[in-house]
Amino acid sequence: MGKKLVMAQRRGETRALCLGVAMVVGAVITYYILGTTVLPLYQKSVWTQESTCHLIETNIRDQEELEGKRVPQYPCLWVNVSSVGRWAVLYHTEDTRDQNHQCSYIPSSLDNYQVARADVEKVRARFHENQDFFCFSTTRENETSVLYRRLYGPQSLLFSLFWPTFLLTGGLLIIVMVKINQSLSILAAQR
């Protein structure tokens, strides 16, 4: 019976070690992928200065064309704010600024014009309710645009790194526990 117990224990230890090593390898692969995709975007982001913006005006433009999409026209919200003592155009995210310089907010549903228009009206009403809000600006002197929300900020970087770190820590803990168990088994067998 003792030999069967030792064999079962070895099989279980081998499986646990394989699980721990697989978790560590998975975490390393995930770190590599995040290091080549998310980290460069975070490092390139110039929108680091948090400031308070005050709403000057909002305008809905109906005849906008989005490059690369099959949508002929869609409503777009254009927002002017004052930030850090200067006039600026507010953009929802970095991607909004890259998609169309004329739009502060591009609705998510572009298939139905009425739904998109209602979405833009809702966002416009929120801006009029809260005329002072936090925004992100750059330290460049001649920049006339600010962001409402950063896509590639420290929070998104930490959120992206949470699960791989959890996976790496769990895998290392499993490996350490198996090795401690093996060394304690050897010590017990020697007595």
UniProtKB/Swiss-Prot annotation:
Any one cellular-component term (Gene Ontology): voltage-gated potassium channel complex
Molecular function (Gene Ontology), one example: calcium-activated potassium channel activity
Which Pfam families did the record assign? CaKB (PF03185)
Please provide the Gene Ontology terms (biological process) for this protein.
detection of calcium ion
Q: How does it sit in the membrane?
A: Multi-pass membrane protein
Which positions are glycosylated?
A: N80, N142
Functional description taken from the UniProt entry: Regulatory subunit of the calcium activated potassium KCNMA1 (maxiK) channel. Modulates the calcium sensitivity and gating kinetics of KCNMA1, thereby contributing to KCNMA1 channel diversity. Increases the apparent Ca(2+)/voltage sensitivity of the KCNMA1 channel. It also modifies KCNMA1 channel kinetics and alters its pharmacological properties. It slows down the activation and the deactivation kinetics of the channel. Acts as a negative regulator of smooth muscle contraction by enhancing the calcium sensitivity to KCNMA1.
**Which cell locations does it reside in?**
Membrane
- The membrane-spanning stretches of this chain are 19-39, 158-178
Q: What is its main location?
A: membrane
- Tell me which species this is from: Bos taurus
User: Which residues does the entry place in the Extracellular compartment?
Assistant: 40-157
User: Record's family?
Assistant: Belongs to the KCNMB (TC 8.A.14.1) family. KCNMB1 subfamily.
Q: Output the PANTHER family linked to this UniProt entry.
A: CALCIUM-ACTIVATED POTASSIUM CHANNEL SUBUNIT BETA (PTHR10258), CALCIUM-ACTIVATED POTASSIUM CHANNEL SUBUNIT BETA-1 (PTHR10258:SF1)
- Modification after translation, per record: N-glycosylated.
| Any coiled-coil regions, as ranges | none
What is the protein name for this chain?
A: Calcium-activated potassium channel subunit beta-1
